[in-house]
Amino acid sequence: KASVSDIPALLELEKSVAGTYIYSPMLEADEWKEELQKGKVYLIEKDDVPIGNLSYEKKSNDHVYISGLVVSPAFQGQGVAREVLIKLLEELKDVRRIDLVTHPDNHVALHLYQSLGFVIESRKENYWGDGEPRLVCVCVCVLSRNK
């Protein structure tokens, strides 16, 4: 689990993906502090080097919102995000609803989410006030397992 001392690494990870299209707003240091207080943030490491992060917020006992997933470009395409999401879904096996938001053009992420049981629930225009639409995805694997 990440802590305030990990904020520089979290900022650096976000900057590392800035060369590619950014599908969500980048957080500043004070926003990372808030994120750490309201939810869980995990630093993904390989050989003690930060290579990504995953953050989520428990909205209620039955609802978790995955607020962020970043993998350093040097480690993308190696199954890092898949492995981390599978572990998270196992950890949250008793949660009835797990959802996340992604850009409709983020085909790699969308394919990953759908392969793990997420379905598109709705499309929201101008979701973060940036003029861009987002897709709200919900994990049906969790919903079906808790019926």
Predicted regions and their residues:
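Conserved catalytic-core motifs of GNAT/GCN5-like acyltransferases
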Residues: D99-T102, Q114, V119-V136
